[in-house]
Regions:
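GHKL-family ATP-binding catalytic core of two-component histidine kinases
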Residues: 31-34, 96, 179
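Basic, Lys/Arg- and aromatic-enriched nucleic-acid-binding interface segment
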Residues: 51, 55, 70, 74-75, ...
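Conserved hydrophobic/aromatic pocket- or pore-lining residues that grip, position, or stack substrates
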Residues: 19, 38, 61-64, 72, ...
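N-terminal core-binding DNA-recognition domain of tyrosine site-specific recombinases/integrases
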Residues: 1-73, 89
């Protein structure tokens, strides 16, 4: 199966910076790799990163070893019987009215003011803000439509930007009301360009 380029870049980074160096340090070759070796890797990683990060490592390892079985480099996938950590439930924290107003005061006039305000008020992701186009803002009907993203990643040692007209999830494609303060701020920004 195929994955998005940004996902591939993330997998490559995990493999080349974390996973492979760990096993190379222990001088463990692919054909010698055991379930216990992988389990020990997860335990070691849990001392420095979250369970969710280790779950991502597991996905990379499992997929790579599944491919190694497919091309007959190894006979069985040692990651198949590893107990991966349980996913941690995300508990978001939010600014209260005073905190958000303090933030807005601090960023007044900063080059990232518009981006930070869009993130804080509308909950836009970084890649949604970077991918925002003037055509997504309907000043007549006062709407803001999220339908384009730009994601940055490193692939083969090169920094690249990936533009996409598909969102992270179906619910990410959305149209929201453009409130008066943001309408005025965005119109002023557009006039300066």
């Amino acid at each position: 199966s195929t994955v998005k380029l940004t996902t591939y870049a993330s997998y490559e980074m995990m493999a080349t910076r974390i996973i492979i160096p760990y096993f190379e340090t222990l001088n463990i070759k692919l054909k010698e790799l055991t379930t216990e070796d992988i389990q020990e890797f997860y335990s070691a990683q849990l001392e420095r990163v979250s369970a969710n990060t280790v779950i991502h490592y597991h996905a990379v390892i499992h997929r790579a070893l599944k491919y190694a079985v497919k091309i007959k480099t190894i006979q069985a996938n040692p990651a198949a019987n590893v107990e991966r950590p349980r996913k941690e439930k995300f508990i978001g924290s939010f600014y209260d009215k005073k905190e958000i107003n303090t933030l807005f005061d601090i960023i007044q006039g900063h080059p990232l003011e518009v981006a930070i305000k869009l993130a804080a008020f509308y909950g836009l992701r970084r890649e949604e803000i970077i991918g925002l186009k003037w055509t997504a803002i309907d000043f007549e009907n006062n709407t803001l439509t999220i339908q384009h993203t730009v994601t940055e990643c490193n692939l083969d040692g090169k920094h690249i930007e990936v533009a996409s007209d598909t969102a992270k999830t179906d619910s990410s494609l959305r149209t929201m009301p453009l409130v008066t303060n943001f309408r005025e701020m965005l119109l002023a920004k557009k006039e300066k360009q």
